Amino acid sequence: MESLQIYLIWSVYGVAIAILIAVASTFICAYQTPRDRSPSVTLICIISITVLLATVLLLPVDIALVSSITSSALGRRKSWATQAEVDKITFSLTIVYYSLYTVDALLCLIGIPFTYFWYEEYDEVAAEAGQQTAGQRFWAAFKYTLFFVAILIVLFLVGFFIPTSRNLAGHDSDFLRRLFTEDRGQHALTFSVGILTTLGLSLYIIYTSSGLARLPVLLMKTAPSFSSPSLIASTAMQLDSNRERQRQLDGRCGGDTALLSSKDRRELDSLVREERTLTRRQRLAEGAQEERRSWPIKVYHKMEAVLHPFKLLAGFVLLLAALFLWTSLCVTAIDKLMNSPCKHRCGYILERVNIFNPVNWVLIQSSRVFPVDYVIFTLIVLFLFCSSVVGIAAFGIRFLWIQIFSIRKGRTSPQALLLLTSMLMLITLALNYSVAVILAPQYATFGPQTFCDMPPVSSGPQPDCSRARNLIKSCSEKAENIGANGLCTPSVASTLLNQMTSNFPFFGAVFFWAQFIFLGLYLLVLVVSVTRSPRLDEHQLDEDAEEAEEERLLARTGRRINTA
């Protein structure tokens, strides 16, 4: 029976990975530009996003497996759950976790950079002329990637030799003591993942918090369309005004711009550039309006009008869900701040949950019927992931407040797609910590596990609470009953994350206080998004018009070449 249960749990995880592959593939194909696609870029992006999300979504499997050894109704271990079987389950989970974390680090620091340089090194003219071979391209990309290989090696070496914190005097317990029992290889990997998570937290704070606030509002508030009659009329008026001013300046100089003052010449040059922009904008808007008259577009807009109330409802539901998540994050953060026994010395670990956490309670109750908790947990993770994408799309990829790439559906370049994937990988690592340690700490540690709060009998049977159900209590990090320490099995994920924050208190302090910045920034962006009406991005519209004009010129040139 136990083998069948374990097999079913892993089967659900396999189905989840298949869904993740479909989600990642759809996401990448939807955002990449059709005219500049690279198979290597597409493949590495899909693999990276799938592996990262698979790492996060392993947590419910972890909870289900460690919880399967006990009966939550009786607070005792099942007959087959010997210590050897328990060790076998936790060891297999540990292997899977460390394998996934290793692949995550390799993809983030080596796989994506190499693919970026591999794409940049491609010279279409040289390749067609036979002057650039695959080996030359590989070596050129590898030389640039060596810098990231060096970073990875340095991280592992520092993590291998750096000492761990032992400053827990007066706060020792079996649970905390177990956090320090790891070998140096695990120590190095934990440190490396901690560094990447720290980098991801800065992105998580900026992009995920803003996206979490903006996503529901975007569904409830729709920006005006660039093909609307009012915009076309406004553009036509601006164009007429522009040309009238140009005629005035031409009349002033009789067609000879050399007779104009320097101020008037600058104004005329500016008017000419503005005229080109307005002409492209008008042509794009009129083309879009013409497309609206075709029957497929008419059907699409009618369906959009019919589904508009459901879109509003979805936005309202997502807003409630976001506030629900925000409340749970805030509650646990305050609980840890007030009740953690060792504070920053162990990463603000809680011995038990002291304040009611709604998300934590929902996940614990649903975990009694697997895979209900898996579905809820997956929806939460995908919601936060999509919020991160919305946040990045809103701000773009920036360096020192300078936008390098824009992220838009169907118009994202391969370079931007690789940078987007690396940012999402770092954000997902930070999300992994926030969900497991802050959003649902009790669920992520022990799940629905319980124990019978009776004094254990030495070398005798387990305590029986079948006639005293009031003595069946939920497992926690520190239970007063001695027998609970041997009965309650923490999840492997919580052990690894708590090892990270306990062995390296710097990580614990940064991870914890970053949550308050996240919560504050979410409220700020939410207030701004709700109070401000959506506007049409004219800069983005002008970029679309310029790209459309380039595509027309390329298509026209291609037809001339084919005709010749």
From Swiss-Prot:
Superkingdom as given in the UniProt entry: Eukaryota
Q: What GO terms fall under cellular component here?
A: vacuolar membrane
GO molecular function per UniProt? cobalamin binding
Membrane topology category: Multi-pass membrane protein
A Pfam family this protein belongs to?
LMBR1
Name the UniProt key words of this record, in alphabetical order.
Answer: Cobalamin, Cobalt, Lysosome, Membrane, Transmembrane, Transmembrane helix, Transport
Its subcellular locations are: Lysosome membrane
Residue ranges spanning the membrane: these are 8-28, 41-61, 94-114, 144-164, 188-208, 312-332, 375-395, 418-438, 506-526
**A biological process (GO) annotation for this entry?**
protein localization to vacuole
The record's listing under PANTHER family reads: LYSOSOMAL COBALAMIN TRANSPORT ESCORT PROTEIN LMBD1, LYSOSOMAL COBALAMIN TRANSPORTER-RELATED
Family membership: Belongs to the LIMR family. LMBRD1 subfamily.
Q: What does this protein do?
A: Probable lysosomal cobalamin transporter. Required to export cobalamin from lysosomes allowing its conversion to cofactors.
Name of the protein in its database record = Probable lysosomal cobalamin transporter
